[in-house]
């Protein structure tokens, strides 16, 4: 049986493509296409997901996953059908009991070493490469894309509102001194909570592990040097190679400390993922992050996320933007297959294409929550996220009866999405045996 990592394109970006020459030092002779941001999900098999739901519903826990989970069942007024899924945390509808949940989390810095560098673009806008080694090390100071005292990528990552407590408000209502995803979960189910202040879903405790080094074969990755228009080197790695390396090498090596009861986050720095051939950058790039699951029993959830400071993706789409997207989706759709009525033509799902899972980041990819000024003086960018009700119901469970945490969505997703007859190619599978 195959497992697939599904990726959908979101939005075109200008910085790199506008600056990229046909060859260094030459005048650009034709318009160059634009890069695209993509996010991804690697779901468990359908039968595994159903087994987890059934176990959690019957016993309050699953032998296939050590995560704290609750099940939900909802009759959607978008299509009249009933849907069941699992979410990380405590059931917001349950009476009494402990409504505070913590997920032990590991930050794993990934040092990526590529073996080639781009020297230009050919007539088909494919990257021309030559031998050359580049090291992307998030533990080292970067004085090209960052400035002291905030020039250490790993420290900035650790200090972000995904891991640290900040004063966060949603629609003028104080969500407390907490992490961004915890604030989102509280706002998402606000109308269901008798005492919202007691409802928490926290990443805690958080521990940073020793860096992992991944040396990328020449055929599976390359680097664009600053001459392509970024403030520093920009790495691209084949996502099939990368995910297989995590599955087969990194995750097994981190056991038993990293296990099915916790959540490892792999920090990439100015390095994105793409599909082969990765030199076809304007077609096969750029996956900034994904949340996935292993095919093992019990299931290991994990998420790689790029902390981008190159500016390639625009001034508001860097740093913690991808991290907020992926962690929120891990919490709300931990196994990648919580079913919803089909929706589409919004966020990273292009017109004529549809998606049908509870991926709370995807409908608003490219749209941000209010930036948060860090105590370190660094401004963190976080993505706006869709509430549970947006996917299922015209009656919002969210704060202010909203459908997203910055009020971009003022109604639910609307009529069930019907894909255009010619809509294909909007998903890109990573296939693992």
Where are these regions (language model features)?
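Active-site-proximal segment of zinc-dependent metalloprotease catalytic domains
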Residues: 234-330, 334-336
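Metalloprotease/metallohydrolase-associated module, dominated by Zn2+-dependent proteases
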Residues: 277-313, 317, 334-433
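Bacterial N-terminal signal peptides that target proteins for export
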Residues: 1-9
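Low-complexity, serine/threonine/proline-enriched polar segments
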Residues: 136-230
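N-terminal module-boundary/linker segments of secreted carbohydrate-active enzymes
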Residues: 24-159, 392-433
């Amino acid at each position: 049986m195959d497992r697939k990592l599904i990726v959908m394109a979101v939005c075109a970006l200008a910085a790199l493509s506008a600056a990229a020459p046909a060859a260094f030092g030459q005048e650009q002779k034709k318009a160059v296409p634009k890069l695209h941001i993509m996010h991804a999900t690697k779901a468990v098999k359908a039968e595994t997901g159903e087994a987890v739901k059934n176990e959690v519903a019957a016993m309050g826990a699953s032998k296939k996953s050590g995560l704290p989970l609750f099940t939900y069942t909802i009759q959607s007024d978008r299509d009249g059908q009933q849907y069941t899924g699992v979410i990380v945390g405590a059931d917001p509808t349950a009476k009494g009991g402990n409504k505070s949940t913590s997920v032990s989390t590991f930050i794993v810095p990934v040092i990526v070493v590529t073996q080639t560098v781009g020297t230009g673009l050919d007539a088909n806008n494919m990257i021309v490469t030559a031998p050359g080694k580049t090291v992307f090390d998030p533990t080292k100071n970067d004085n090209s894309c960052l400035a002291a005292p905030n020039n250490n990528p790993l420290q900035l990552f650790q200090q972000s509102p995904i891991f640290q407590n900040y004063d966060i408000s949603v629609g003028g209502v104080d969500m407390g001194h907490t992490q961004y995803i915890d604030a989102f979960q509280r706002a998402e189910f606000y109308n269901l909570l008798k005492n919202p202040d007691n409802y928490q879903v926290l990443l805690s405790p958080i521990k940073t592990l020793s860096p992992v080094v991944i040396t990328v074969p020449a055929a599976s990755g390359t680097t664009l040097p600053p001459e392509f228009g970024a403030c520093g080197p920009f790495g691209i790695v084949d996502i099939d190679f990368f995910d297989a390396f995590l599955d087969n090498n990194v995750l097994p090596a981190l056991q038993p400390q990293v296990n099915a009861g916790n959540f490892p986050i792999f920090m990439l720095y100015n390095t994105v993922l793409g599909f082969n051939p990765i030199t076809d950058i304007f077609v096969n790039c750029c996956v900034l992050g994904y949340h996935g699951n292993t095919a093992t029993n019990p299931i290991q959830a994990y998420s790689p996320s790029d902390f981008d400071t190159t500016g390639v993706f625009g001034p508001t789409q860097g740093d913690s933007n991808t991290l907020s997207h992926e962690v929120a989706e891990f919490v709300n759709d931990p196994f990648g297959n919580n079913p919803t009525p089909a929706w589409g033509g919004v966020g990273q799902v292009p017109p004529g294409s549809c998606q049908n899972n509870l991926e709370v980041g995807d409908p608003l990819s490219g749209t941000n929550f209010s930036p948060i000024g860090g105590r370190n003086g660094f401004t963190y960018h976080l993505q706006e996220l869709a509430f549970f009700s947006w996917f299922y119901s015209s009656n919002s469970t969210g704060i202010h009866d909203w459908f997203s945490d910055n009020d971009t969505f003022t109604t639910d997703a609307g009529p069930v999405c019907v894909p255009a007859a010619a809509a294909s190619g909007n998903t890109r599978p990573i296939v693992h045996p």
